[in-house]
Amino acid sequence: MKEIYRLVDVSYKYPNGSIALDNVNLNIYKNEVVAILGPNGAGKTTLLKILDGLVFPDKGEVYFEGKKLTDEILRDKELMKEFRRKVGFVFQNPDVMLFNPTVWDEVAFSPLHLYSKEKAIEVTDKTLKDMKIYHLKDRHPYNLSGGEKKKVSISCILSVEPEVILMDEPTSALDPKSRAEIMNLIKSFKECGKTVVLVTHDLNLACLADRCYVLNKKVIFEGKVKDLFSLNLDELNLDVPEISKLFIKLKNMGYNINEIPVTLDEAVNIISKLFQKY
């Protein structure tokens, strides 16, 4: 399996001297979806910024596709252009990414800098249609709903066909319909062979991941989402599904519960197995 990122003993301090990350080690592989979980202030967004080359660690090493990622390397215009084409960052607040007069202009911004005008127009129109927001192309981004803005910000990244997509809380503050649409998008990214790293508090979203890391300055857990229930979830400030809370309560009451489901389908599966025993 091709290694996309490798972080070795990465530490980072904020300008005020407080620690954001402390000796973080992790690996991310091609075509993986990896979730980064943890309480507020755990360093999750800082980690994404390091993966995106927006900030660099005070200590430790970051490798992208086997090559060391440094400030000096990204000062090279050609290397920076290639890295930016391969890696896209979707910020938690889409407003920070939206600064053009229309949705079409937003999505076309990067293609117009990377491709010929003809190809840029073609790629932009295709992206808008694929994302089902072509009808919004002449609208001003600030007049859109939260879910529509999120789709536009994701479209801005997809228009340059990145291989890696970094997403900071992609479903936060969205209504259930918009949340479901974003989750389906993330599923489609994996099907297209893309690598996705997402920061989230939402266990339902994290269930899309092949693996997850729990951060609290350091890596305190690495593994499958279903194995998270061995940790103190209250301390991690995670959005735990109600069905999971129900099974945790039943287990604490003494019932023979060996698995904690995250989705309704998983819960039905577990209950069916229990009924078969009686």
Swiss-Prot record:
Lineage: Archaea, Methanobacteriati, Methanobacteriota, Methanomada group, Methanococci
Function in brief: Probably part of an ABC transporter complex. Responsible for energy coupling to the transport system.
Stretches assigned to the ABC transporter domain: 5-242
SUPFAM superfamilies to which the protein is assigned, alphabetical: P-loop containing nucleoside triphosphate hydrolases (SSF52540)
Compartments it resides in: Cell membrane
GO CC annotations, alphabetized: ATP-binding cassette (ABC) transporter complex
Example GO molecular function: ATPase-coupled transmembrane transporter activity
Family to which the UniProt record says this protein belongs: Belongs to the ABC transporter superfamily.
Chloroplast is among the record's keywords: no
Protein EC: 7.-.-.-
Binding site for ATP: G38, P39, N40, G41, A42, G43, K44, T45
Topological type in the membrane: Peripheral membrane protein
Highest taxon above the source species: Archaea
PANTHER family reported in the protein's UniProt record: ENERGY-COUPLING FACTOR TRANSPORTER ATP-BINDING PROTEIN ECFA2 (PTHR43553:SF27), HEAVY METAL TRANSPORTER (PTHR43553)
Descriptive protein name: Putative ABC transporter ATP-binding protein MJ1572
InterPro entries reported in the protein's UniProt record: AAA+_ATPase, ABC_transporter-like_ATP-bd, ABC_transporter-like_CS, ABC_transpr_CbiO/EcfA_su, ECF_ABC_transporter_ATP-bd, P-loop_NTPase
Keywords, ordered alphabetically: ATP-binding, Cell membrane, Membrane, Nucleotide-binding, Translocase, Transport
